[in-house]
């Protein structure tokens, strides 16, 4: 059997040796972020709907330097071989990072990270969409990250949910996302790219990781949860509560953007 001789054979999962340093030898991680924003504050958000004229619905969102645009196409008829699946619609999500969006230039071909993010995005959005109202139909959600400055998955969930609402897709509730970076006993809500992958990732000891949560705010139900790293159970529970609070902080901005889009599409009053 031919093998790849240039591939470095290593374990499927590995941990940083810095995690096993004794507390007295480990350097102290920062307890607060730099600047005027507090640890529990989200970045200022700019949101608009209906920017892509060719799509059934679209949305654009900015959170700091993170910029994401989403387009929704459908529902369109689809043929399936499995008769049991024809009673409900199908939600297809495509998550892509623009080659110029990250510090290191990427490729147009979708990589494994983008495929994983696409699957997580679909799992987060599906509980909020009334797929039973669209039998034998398919709804395509295309997300493009124009600039990655952290918390892209959470803001992609919010942007895609706004685009679905702008397209007139029936939903149980809007879906909002929030990310938290945990470092020891301190946490950062809506972290930037530097906070996700910079000095904060060099923390030591336990309770190190990131948590991304998707929430249906009116129903107060969690539709998606993605956690990386190693955290205690009580720390993870508190991180989820903090992310839920962050989602509720975004809700007025999203509601205002959707209201503005509806008023713009509404026909003028008859004289």
From Swiss-Prot:
Cell compartment(s), UniProt: Cytoplasm; Nucleus, Nucleolus; Nucleus
Gene Ontology CC: one annotated term: exosome (RNase complex)
UniProt cross-references to Pfam families, sorted A to Z: RNase_PH (PF01138)
Biological-process GO terms, alphabetical: nuclear mRNA surveillance; poly(A)-dependent snoRNA 3'-end processing; rRNA catabolic process; rRNA processing; U4 snRNA 3'-end processing
UniProt-recorded Gene Ontology molecular function terms: RNA binding
Compositionally biased intervals (Basic and acidic residues): 1-12
Disulfide bond in keyword set: no
Keyword annotations: Cytoplasm, Exosome, Nucleus, RNA-binding, rRNA processing
Annotated InterPro entries: ExoRNase_PH_dom1, ExoRNase_PH_dom2_sf, PNPase/RNase_PH_dom_sf, Ribosomal_Su5_D2-typ_SF, RNase_PH
Spans annotated as Disordered: 1-39
Broad class of the protein's primary localization: cytoplasm
Functional summary from the UniProt entry: Non-catalytic component of the RNA exosome complex which has 3'->5' exoribonuclease activity and participates in a multitude of cellular RNA processing and degradation events.
Subunit-level organization: Component of the RNA exosome complex.
UniProt family annotation: Belongs to the RNase PH family.
Protein name as it appears in the record: Exosome complex component MTR3
Gene: exosc6
